[in-house]
Amino acid sequence: MIQISDKAQTYFRKLIEREGVPGMGVRLSAVDAGTPRADARLEFAEPADLRGDEWAIDCDGFTLYVVAASVPWMDGAEIDYVTQSTGNQQLTIKAPKIKGEAPAESASMVERVRWVVENEINPQLASHGGRVAVQEVSADGVVLLRFGGGCHGCGMADVTLKQGIEKTLMGRVPGVIAVRDATDHATGDAPYIPRDSAA
């Protein structure tokens, strides 16, 4: 079920009226659904643009069409038009399922570690152009990672590993007892902080 506030409906209706195209609606879709990069996309949809498999939600003065493949990702979404503390108004979409759901506690440790790495750790490392990949998760709970991008060869990789990644994984995935680095940092060609300048 998707909730669309009255304010959001009024906002959409005004935009559609300005376009002046009979039968125009709004199409909602999930982009890169199930990944950390997931986002919602809204766009005008003329009747000729529709594929026929969209879910139609009748609103006050227009129809919101949800792309069929996006329906599971948009379940529980809320669309609103809010006034920010600065006085500016903004359309907001909260779609709690769009990035996927964390694996159940009954899932394997490997699945849970990969989910935390992809959905929590890598988005933070991306701000420095870095990333990590899970190379191995041993039966006794030792996670072996390989750094890439700006983290490959970075002088702060050890700090990131121990104070960031290891703490996060041990706190979020029961059974993880240690995190190790399998990266040959001497081969990094574009580190965020070169190893010889880290103190």
Swiss-Prot record:
It comes from Xanthomonas oryzae pv. oryzae (strain PXO99A). Its cofactor is [4Fe-4S] cluster. The keyword Iron applies. GO terms for biological process: iron-sulfur cluster assembly; protein maturation. Pfam families: NifU. This is Fe/S biogenesis protein NfuA. Binds 1 [4Fe-4S] cluster per subunit. The cluster is presumably bound at the interface of two monomers. It comes from the Bacteria. [4Fe-4S] cluster binds at residues 151, 154.
